[in-house]
């Protein structure tokens, strides 16, 4: 009898967690985007700080990331989606390089 109760409790917990995780996934999918995706000119200059704040949110070098991201955004009027990569979304942002040939924009 005790085994039956333990199996029932474990099954109930697994069933409950399955539904609670599904609700979280739905709410994440319906959340509004932090900034627009798109190519060059898809942002207005006043939208750059918020887009760069998100772009630089995962780096340990936050201050230089924000400086260069805002500089690039003000020139290109776009910031790639996500916190890393996706530079193909914004050719100007992707192709602007330093004198040494490295990427200027984070």
From Swiss-Prot:
InterPro entries xrefs: GASA
Cleavable signal peptide: 1-22
Source organism, top-level taxon: Eukaryota
Post-translational modification: Six disulfide bonds may be present.
GO biological process: gibberellic acid mediated signaling pathway
Principal subcellular localization: secreted
An annotated GO cellular component: extracellular region
The keyword Acyltransferase is assigned to this record: no
Keywords: Disulfide bond, Gibberellin signaling pathway, Secreted, Signal
Task performed by this protein: Gibberellin-regulated protein that may function in hormonal controlled steps of development such as seed germination, flowering and seed maturation.
Protein family: Belongs to the GASA family.
Protein name: Gibberellin-regulated protein 12
Species annotation: Arabidopsis thaliana (Mouse-ear cress)
